[in-house]
Structures are given as C-alpha cells and as structure tokens.
C-alpha cells in the first residue's frame, strides 16, 4: 500500500469511529432526548410568545459597558421605580426623572426599544437642589 492509501484509510476509519461514538451517545441518552422533546414540543412551530412581548435581546444598553456602576438597572425609589445608572436617571421630555409604577414597566422601557437618549444626573446640579436624588443614585450604585 502506498502512503496516500494509508492516509485515506486512516481518515475513513476515524470518520466511522466518530459516527459510531455519536450513535452510541444518542443511544445512551435516548430517554433524556425524548423527555426534552416532549417538554418542548409545543414550541416547535411557534413564532412568538404572543401578547405584548418585548424582545430584550435586540437592544440592551448594558452590552457595551464594562463598569458595573454604569450599567442601567431598575431601582425602587419610594413607591415608584426609576432607571438608574452612574450617568443618572432616564428623563421625561421636560427634564424630570422618568418614573414607572411597576418594575415590569421599568424593565420594558429600559431594555426595550423606547427613546433612552434623555438622561438627567442630579449629582451635577451646582445648587445642590437635588441632593436627595443624588444620594439615592449613589446608594443604588
């Protein structure tokens, strides 16, 4: 046998061994595979979860941030929720901090596709009029 034939014989033997190992792995785990398929069969042809679902994987303001204090989060401020970060709070068009009645509303806004370009930072107020907001912001970071 020439060396080229030996090489192809070794490659073919390795391919057959790999296929046999994969078949054995499926055989050993077949019960688990059936259990998984039964548990997730209802999702096989589904296109979406339905309702007012927001895909939070498309836009996440924390993806490009390495510093943990700069990551956006929803925090309970009194009886309302606010979106907070080292940059400040997400703001209303009039410049006041944006508040949410539920945590889900806050999460949907913060990690949804809403306009998040307005930010107000109470710690940069030279008059110190927003000292309470600044203290809260520093406490949640």
UniProtKB/Swiss-Prot annotation:
Give the GO cellular component terms, alphabetically. membrane; viral envelope; virion membrane
Do you know which InterPro entries this protein is assigned to? Poxvirus_A28
Q: Which Pfam families match?
A: Pox_A28 (PF04584)
Q: What does the record say about PTM?
A: Contains two intramolecular disulfide bonds. They are created by the viral disulfide bond formation pathway, a poxvirus-specific pathway that operates on the cytoplasmic side of the MV membranes.
What is the predominant subcellular site recorded for this chain? virion
Tell me the keywords, alphabetical order. Disulfide bond, Fusion of virus membrane with host membrane, Late protein, Membrane, Signal-anchor, Transmembrane, Transmembrane helix, Viral envelope protein, Viral penetration into host cytoplasm, Virion, Virus entry into host cell
Q: Where does the chain cross the membrane? A: 1-21
Per the record, membrane topology reads:
Single-pass type II membrane protein
**Cellular compartment(s):** Virion membrane
Alphabetically, which GO biological process terms does the record hold?
Answer: membrane fusion involved in viral entry into host cell; symbiont entry into host cell
Membrane-side (Virion surface) residue stretches: 22-140
What family does this chain come from, according to its entry? Belongs to the poxviridae A28 protein family.
Question: Main role?
Answer: Envelope protein required for virus entry into host cell and for cell-cell fusion (syncytium formation).
This chain belongs to the protein called Envelope protein A28 homolog
Tell me which species this is from. Molluscum contagiosum virus subtype 1
What taxonomic ancestry is recorded?
Answer: Viruses, Varidnaviria, Bamfordvirae, Nucleocytoviricota, Pokkesviricetes
